[in-house]
UniProtKB/Swiss-Prot annotation:
PROSITE patterns found in the cross-reference section: MDH
GO cellular component: cytoplasm
Native organism: Shewanella loihica (strain ATCC BAA-1088 / PV-4)
Subunit composition and interactions: Homodimer.
UniProt-annotated binding residues for substrate: R81, R87, N119, R153
Name used for this protein in its record: Malate dehydrogenase
Binding site for NAD(+): G7, A8, A9, G10, G11, I12, G13, D34, N94, I117, T118, N119, M227
Entry keyword annotation includes Membrane: no
Length: 311
């Protein structure tokens, strides 16, 4: 099993690479790429960690050597948020980066499962899809927007608020991956009840958690460590699905035939071909239904921005 991380010298990429080096199945290969010349050194650094995962690093303009034979590609390349920026401000820089990298994936590893981490995910996933379509290799079951950070934040914040063991808390998060498009389905959490005020406050905190980190770091970065953990969880789930493990389910932003938008985050069953089945997200509360309906114009506009960028 070969996993490639594109953007591996960045804050998310290095955290993700460290976690994958320590957690990928024995015998896996981990391939790191970044434009930054430090990248082969990141691989050497990681190679000193005693796990049976082979690491190689590649720098420069062309990611092709890193992508050859990849089963899973995780793309975190791009610029990070700074105070005062929202995820859409990132679009102007990151859109071109994602387009160029996905073009290389289409040429080098067209059957790989691709997880897009680079923000704004609502838009960059649509860009990736259009690039893959133009290359004639698009398979909607092999492209994912990684929204796992919203899930782990939801699980953490709910556990803290209710005094629960976080390992026992499971939260589905639907919609998209920025602001109001992030919708945690708090009404579905078993054995927990929330007041209307708690639901509103928790939902808002989850939606704005990225800003919480950006402001707390005071211009020194964004949510790199928690995003690295979230991306590792999702990447390992992709690997487990590819290896034939049963009942591997994660939420992800996918082209899943949603009635709501061309791309929509919801639970998916993972398997040997990527998405085996898009799962229904179930009954929602009135608050959640209203929030879902209210986000759709924003989500659709984000998607259109990506489609138009490629065309």
């Amino acid at each position: 099993m070969k996993v490639a991380v594109l953007g591996a010298a960045g804050g998310i990429g290095q955290a993700l690479a460290l976690l994958l080096k320590t957690q990928l199945p024995a015998g896996s290969k981990l391939s790191l790429y970044d434009i930054a010349p430090v990248t082969p050194g990141v691989a050497v650094d990681l190679s000193h960690i005693p796990t049976a995962v082979e690491v190689k690093g590649f720098a420069g303009e062309d990611p092709t050597p890193a992508l050859e034979g990849a089963d899973v590609v995780l793309i975190s390349a791009g610029v990070a948020r700074k105070p005062g920026m929202d995820r859409s401000d990132l679009f102007n820089i990151n859109a071109g980066i994602v387009r160029n990298l996905v073009e290389k994936c289409a040429a080098t590893c067209p059957k790989a499962l691709i997880g897009i981490i680079t923000n704004p995910v609502n838009t960059t996933v649509a860009i990736a899809a259009e690039v893959l379509k133009a290359a004639g290799v698009y398979d909607k079951n092999r492209l994912f927007g990684v929204t796992t950070l919203d899930v782990i934040r939801s699980e953490t914040f709910v556990a803290e608020a209710k005094g629960l063991n976080v390992a026992d808390v499971k939260v589905n998060v639907i919609g998209g991956h920025s602001g109001v498009t992030i919708l945690p389905l708090l009404s579905q959490i078993e054995g927990v009840s929330f007041s209307d005020e708690e639901v509103a406050a928790l939902t808002t905190r989850i939606q704005n958690a990225g800003t919480e980190v950006v402001e707390a770091k005071a211009g020194g970065g964004s949510a790199t460590l928690s995003m690295g953990q979230a991306a590792c969880r999702f990447g390992l789930s992709l690997v487990r699905g590819l290896q034939g493990e049963a009942n591997v389910v994660e939420c992800a932003y996918v082209d899943g035939g949603s009635e709501h938008a061309d791309f929509f985050a919801q639970p998916v069953l993972l398997g040997k071909n990527g998405i085996e089945q898009v799962l229904a997200y179930g009954e929602v509360s009135e608050f959640e239904a209203n929030a879902r309906d209210a986000m759709l114009d924003t989500l659709k506009a984000d998607i259109t921005l990506g489609v138009d960028f490629v065309k």
